[in-house]
Amino acid sequence: MTTTKRPIALLILDGWGYRENTHMNAIFHAKTPVLDRLNAQYPHGLISGSGLDVGLPDGQMGNSEVGHINLGSGRIVYQELTRISKAISDHEFETNPALCDAVDSAINAGGAVHIMGLLSPGGVHSHEEHIEAMCRMAVARGATKVYLHAFLDGRDTPPRSAKASLSHFDDLFTTLGHGRVASIIGRYFAMDRDNRWDRVSQAYELITQGKAKFQYDNAVTALEAAYARDENDEFVSSSAITDVDGKVATLQDGDALIFMNFRADRARQITRSFIHPDFDGFERAVVPKMHFVTLTEYAGDITAPIAYPSENLVNTLGEVLQNRGRTQLRISETEKYAHVTFFFNGGKEEPFEGEDRILINSPKVATYDLQPEMSSTELTDKLVAAIESTKYDVIICNYPNGDMVGHTGNFDAAVKACEAVDTCIGRVVEALAKVGGECIITADHGNAEQMTDETTGQAHTAHTSELVPFIFVGRDATIDKGGKLSDVAPTILQLIGETIPAEMTGKPLIHIKE
C-alpha cells in the first residue's frame, strides 16, 4: 500500500545572495514576483554561508561543495582548505606519506615530479599556497625536475588576475634552484565537469605530449599573448612553456603526477583520463605509467593514493532519513547534481535506502549566459511530478542558474537566469500547496547579487560572502536570526517530527506557532 506523503522540499538557489547595494545586482534588478510575494507572506530571514560559519577561514567566500556539505550534515564541517593550510603551517604537510611516496618514487626512477592544479588564491577548488608548499617539499626531498602545469582561474578570481600568480611561481622556482612552470591552460578546459571531453583532452594532451595551440618560453609571456587574443584566464588556450633549450616538459613513465585541487567535482574527469585503464572519454595517444596522487578524495571509483582522505560524516540528513524509514528525492541539473547527492551526503557516492535521484542534463552550450534559463523548465517538470506523486517525505532540489550564469559575468543574462528561477519556484510552491507540502527556500552562497568588481570595474565572476535568503513557505512560524547553513538539516528533521541526532550541532531555525 502506498502512503501519501506531505513532502517538505528544500529549494537551493545556487549563487543567490542578499546584497543591499543594488548596483549591478542581478537578483535585485530581476523581476521576481513569486519570491517577492513569498517574502511578503511567509516568515523569512537571512543565514550565513561563508567563512567560519561553514568551516572556512574567516572572511572566505562560500562555495557549492562547502555549502552542500554543511546543508546536508547539519554541522559546521572543517573544510579541506582550512585542514590542508593547517597541515602546512604545522609542518605536517611535508611528511605526508602519499605525497612523499610520489616524490620519492619519481626521484628513484630518475623521473620528474609534475604538479598540476588550479593556480589561484581563490580558495574554492585549490589554493596556490598549497601548490607552493608542494613545490618546496618536492625540491627539499631532492627532486631536480619539478614541473608545474597551471590551470588558470578567472572565475573564482577576477577574469584577468593570473599574472601575479605566474610571476610569483617564476620567482619561487628561481629561489629554489629547480623547477619551472611547464604549461598553462584555462580551467574551462582542464576542469570541465559536464563530460565535454573535447575540452579535457586538450589539457591531457598538453601534459602528456606537450601538444598545445601555442608555445612560449615564459609563462607570463604566454598569458599576455592570451590576453592579446582576448582570452581571459578561464579560457586561456593550451600553451606549452619551453625551457632554455626550447624543450617542453611532458609526463613520462616513472614520473609522479600530483593533483593539488582539493575540491572533487571539477577534478574527477581529468583524473579519470589519467588513471582509468578503460577510459573512453577520448582517444589517448599515450598513457604514461606514473605515480598519480590526489590531494583529497574525488570519487569512489578513483583508486589513486589520497594525501588527505575524507573524514567520515555520520548521521547526515540523508542517513537519518534512511534510518527512520523515510523517503527522499535528490534532483538537479548536471552542473549541481553531485552537490545534491555526493556532497549533500557528506562525501558518500551511493544513495541511501529510500533515496531516489533525478538528473536533468544541463544544456550543451559554451557558456551559460547563452541559455540563462539552463534546463530549469525540464527540472521543474520532473520536480512537480515528484511532488504530485506524494511519494517522498523530503525533496532536495538545486537550481544552478544564479551561480552558473553569475560566473559568466554577464549581467543581463544573470537577470534572465534569476527570472527563470523565480517562475519555476512559483510552479513548485503551487504543486506543494496542492498536496499539503511545505518548503524551505535558501542558497548555498552568493554570486549573482554582485556582477561587477567595485574596485577594478571588471566583471565580478566569483562567489561572495553575503548572507543568503531563508524562506519558509508553510505553517505560521517564526524564524531565528543568526542562522547558518548547518542549521537547515536539523530544521527539516524537526519539521517532519523526527528527533535530531547528537552529531548535528546545528539548531532548528523554524518555530511553528501553536
Swiss-Prot record:
List, alphabetically, the GO terms of the cellular component aspect. Answer: cytosol
**EC number(s) reported in the record:** 5.4.2.12
Keywords, ordered alphabetically: Glycolysis, Isomerase, Manganese, Metal-binding
Q: Does the keyword Oxidoreductase apply?
A: no
Name the chemical reaction catalysed here. (2R)-2-phosphoglycerate = (2R)-3-phosphoglycerate
Binding of Mn(2+) 2 occurs at 14, 64, 444-445
Where does the chain bind substrate? 125, 155-156, 187, 193, 263-266, 336
Q: Where does Mn(2+) 1 bind?
A: 403, 407, 463
The active site lies at 64
Cofactor note (record): Binds 2 manganese ions per subunit.
**Which terms does the record give in the GO molecular function aspect?**
manganese ion binding; phosphoglycerate mutase activity
CDD domains named in the record: iPGM (cd16010)
Checking HAMAP family in the record gives: GpmI
Function comment: Catalyzes the interconversion of 2-phosphoglycerate and 3-phosphoglycerate.
Under what name is this protein listed? Answer: 2,3-bisphosphoglycerate-independent phosphoglycerate mutase
Q: What is the lineage of its organism?
A: Bacteria, Pseudomonadati, Pseudomonadota, Gammaproteobacteria, Alteromonadales
Gene name per UniProt: gpmI
